[in-house]
């Protein structure tokens, strides 16, 4: 958190897109570190290119149970009720919930890329692109897979992978966008 504060103190904008594990993050990062929190997708122009940036959680996912659960987690009423619980109980509940979620995946890994016609973030993006053809780059996290896919002659989707297993991130140099992987001792920042 100190490094985030150092960056924002230097005038670097730091944006954080909340996802399925961050729904209740509150305003701590904003108040203490100067981080801009985004709970919804953001469309922005950078060096003449149009970007659609989002965590990816809930975008195009057809699972009705997931949608209902997500709506419950985003409910201010339920958040208020949960915050009234003693931390001993709320932490226990949260940790058990996370453990149960991890155990659903026997190997502990995110499902592999399901293909262009089955990957729900790709399907969502293709549909969104029909009504927003000016967007050049769609960048997501959430799926924990690395993907760089051309959707048209002017539009691409990138799914970033993650910072725990792949150490992956996107770089835009003003002209080109590409995925990189941080390698300690080799990657120049």
Region locations from a protein language model:
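Short amphipathic alpha-helical patches
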Residues: 27-31, 92, 96, 105-108, ...
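Conserved beta-sheet core of the metallophosphoesterase superfamily
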Residues: 34-40, 52, 57, 61-73, ...
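N-terminal short leaders/motifs
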Residues: 1-6, 104-135
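Glycine-rich phosphate-binding loop signature in dinucleotide/nucleotide-binding domains
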Residues: 10, 46-48, 130-134
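Core catalytic region of metal-dependent phosphoesterases/phosphodiesterases
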Residues: 1-46, 165
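Active-site-proximal loop/helix segment associated with metal-binding centers of metalloenzymes
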Residues: 56-120
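Short, solvent-exposed aromatic-acidic interface loops
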Residues: 181-188
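A broad, low-specificity signal for short, low-complexity segments enriched in glycine/proline
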Residues: 8-18, 97-101, 117-121, 138-142
